[in-house]
């Protein structure tokens, strides 16, 4: 009898442990959101019909020479895409080389995937744009009211190095377009200049993924680190911090330029861009 009681107690204890582990697994996305990863952002209800937005991404798909697969961080593309399209904005996808946009595989895996990512996977129109993105050389930037640059590790290899992208961003700025970026997407500003030929970011309040977050994630082999490069170019870099910067969040605006710190900033960045556009009308 005593042995049976002990066995029942052990069994109940093990069941309790398993139930606790299962609950933690189920609740992990919610816990991460509570800590600051992909926080819920209450979108404004805009109707910006007859306006156009361009989302620009990387075309680079590997970390280093023959390293792990990478690309654009999915939510940094999908969240702004649906924020814009739900406001009745026509949205195009472009990339440095055109064609199929590489997506960071880890950004589509549990528990990092978002509702916008899941929506995009089922959206045939989005998937067609993703697989047939417009080459940046072929873009007529004058057609767009909003220009947004998504991040991801791949962006460290081609956004900041593209003179063509720099020319497009320079022209967009000169034409009073609203330009935004999140995370590594801010590297797309590096080749852009103002009307005097100075670095466009010089003296501007900007944010992007921090050196601290890059070091914490241990992916330091990428050629350009946004915080370092923006500071070198003369930007007034600002950011928030957390016990791990992957849980931090910050969005800043300087005139028509809106920048978000990391993947947590996508919704707020897109909404602030739309607010600026709405205020122009």
Task: Name these PLM-found stretches.
Residues 2-175, 187-281:
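Extended, subdomain-level signal for the structured scaffold at the beginning of enzyme domains
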Residues 178:
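Active-site cofactor/cluster-binding pocket
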Residues 181-186:
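Short, thiol/selenol-centered motifs that function as redox-active sites or metal-ligating centers
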């Amino acid at each position: 009898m005593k042995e049976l009681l002990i066995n029942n107690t052990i069994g109940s204890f093990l069941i309790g442990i398993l139930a606790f582990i299962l609950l933690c697994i189920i609740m992990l996305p919610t816990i991460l959101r509570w800590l600051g990863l992909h926080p819920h952002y209450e979108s404004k209800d805009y109707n910006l019909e007859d306006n156009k937005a361009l989302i620009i991404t990387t075309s680079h798909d590997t970390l280093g020479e023959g390293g792990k697969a990478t690309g654009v961080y999915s939510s940094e593309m999908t969240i702004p895409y649906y924020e814009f399209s739900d406001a009745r904005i026509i949205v195009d996808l472009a990339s440095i080389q055109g064609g199929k946009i590489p997506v960071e595989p880890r950004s589509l895996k549990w528990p990092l995937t978002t509702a916008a990512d899941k929506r995009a996977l089922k959206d045939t129109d989005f998937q067609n744009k993703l697989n047939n993105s417009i080459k940046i050389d072929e873009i007529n930037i004058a057609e767009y009211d909003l220009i947004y640059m998504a991040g991801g590790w791949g962006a460290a290899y081609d956004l900041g190095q593209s003179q063509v992208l720099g020319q497009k961003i320079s022209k967009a700025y000169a034409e009073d377009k609203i330009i935004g970026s999140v995370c590594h997407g801010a590297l797309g500003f590096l080749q852009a200049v103002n009307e005097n030929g100075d670095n466009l970011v010089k003296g501007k309040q900007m944010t992007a993924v921090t050196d601290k977050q890059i070091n914490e994630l241990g992916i330091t082999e990428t050629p350009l680190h946004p915080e370092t490069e923006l500071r070198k170019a003369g930007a007034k870099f600002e950011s928030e911090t957390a016990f791990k910067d992957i849980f931090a969040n910050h969005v800043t605006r300087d005139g028509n330029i809106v920048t978000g710190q990391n993947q947590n900033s996508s919704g707020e960045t897109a909404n602030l861009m739309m607010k600026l556009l709405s205020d122009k009308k």
